[in-house]
C-alpha cells in the first residue's frame, strides 16, 4: 500500500506540473493571426516621445542615454516580481520548477517580440480579470500583461476604447502595494498619449496623495512619481499639482538618490512652465536642502537641481513679482534662493571638495541670480 501511495503522489505531481507548463505555453506562444491583425493596426513599435506634443522630461530620460527605446515606458517580463518585492509568491519547494518554466518561455517573452501582443479580444478578457478578480496574484499577473501591451502605441487606444482606464484606476484603492505598483505602471504606460492624459487627469490628485504618503523610496512611490512626470510633460495639467510642490521638495530632501532624481524630473517639468514659477517659489522647502551642497557624491543631483533653479530664475519677472514678495513666507523656495549665497560659498570655498563642473555651474548661477532675481539695486 505504501508503494502504491507513493506512485499515486508522483503521478499527481507530474500531471499538475504538466498542466502548469501547458498553461504557461498557451499564455506565451505567438499566434500568427494576432500578428496579422496587429500589422493592420500599427507597426507595434514602442513610440519614442509619445503622442503628446511639446514633451519635456519623460520618465527615465537621461541626458547621457543614447538608446532609441522609449524612456517613458515600463516593461515587465510576465514572471517579474510576482508576489513580494523580493520575488515570487510560490513556496520554496516550487521555486526550482518555476525557474525551469521561466527559462523555457523567456526567449518568447521579450518586448521586441509580437508573441506578447494580445488581440483586442484577449485584452478584453484581461480587463475582465482585473475588474472581477479579488485575488492579488491574479490581479498582478493581469496588470503585468496590460502594462506590457500598453507599451505599444496602438494598444493604448484599444485599452482606452475598451474602458480600461477607469478599470485600472480603480485598483489604486487597493492596500496591496505590489498590485498598486503594477496598476501605476499600467497607467504610466497608457499616459504616453494625449487623449489618455485628458482622461487620466481626474486621478492625478489621488496618485499625488498616494505618492507622498507611501513608504519612502518604495516601489509604489517611484511608480507614482513616474506617472506624475509623464502627466506633466505638457503645461496643461501642471496646475493640479500646485499644492503638492512642498511635498515633492520634502521627498527630494529625505529620499535616496533614485527618489531624488525622479522628483527632479517632475520638478523640472514644472520649472519650465513660466505659469508655475510663483507656485514653485511659494513652496516650502526643508532646511536640510542647503546641506545637499555639502555632499560631493551628489554631483548629478546638484547639477539637475541647478537647472531647475536656473529655469525659475529665467522665468522670474521682477516687475511682476516685486509687489508679491511679502506673500512669500519664511522657509519658502524664494527665501532659500535669496540666501543661496551661503550654499555657494560652501561649494566655491577653498576647502570644497566638489567637482570642477559643479563649482563652475554654481558660480554662474549665483551671478545670474544676483543680476536678475535679486539685483542689489532692488534690495
Curated annotation (Swiss-Prot):
Ranges for the region named Mitochondrion outer membrane (MOM)-targeting sequence are 1-6, 26-37
Family that this chain belongs to: Belongs to the eutherian X-chromosome-specific Armcx family.
- Location of the region described as Disordered in the Swiss-Prot/TrEMBL record: 95-116
**Tissue specificity comment:** Highly expressed in the developing neural tissues, neural crest derivatives and hind limbs. Also widely expressed in the adult nervous tissue, especially in the forebrain, including the cerebral cortex, hippocampus and thalamus.
Compositional bias (Basic residues) = 95-106
Return one Gene Ontology term, BP aspect. Answer: protein localization
Nuclear localization signal: region residues:
89-98
* The name this protein goes by in its record: Armadillo repeat-containing X-linked protein 3
The subcellular localization recorded is: Mitochondrion outer membrane; Cytoplasm; Nucleus
Query: Briefly, what is this protein's role?
Result: Regulates mitochondrial aggregation and transport in axons in living neurons. May link mitochondria to the Trak2-kinesin motor complex via its interaction with Miro and Trak2. Mitochondrial distribution and dynamics is regulated through Armcx3 protein degradation, which is promoted by PCK and negatively regulated by Wnt1. Enhances the Sox10-mediated transactivation of the neuronal acetylcholine receptor subunit alpha-3 and beta-4 subunit gene promoters.
Provide GO CC annotations from the record.
axon cytoplasm; cytosol; mitochondrial outer membrane; mitochondrion; nucleus
Give any Pfam family that matches: Arm_2
Entry keyword Secreted: no
Per the record's keyword annotation, is Mitochondrion included, yes or no?
Answer: yes
Q: Which residues lie on this side of the membrane: Mitochondrial intermembrane?
A: 1-6
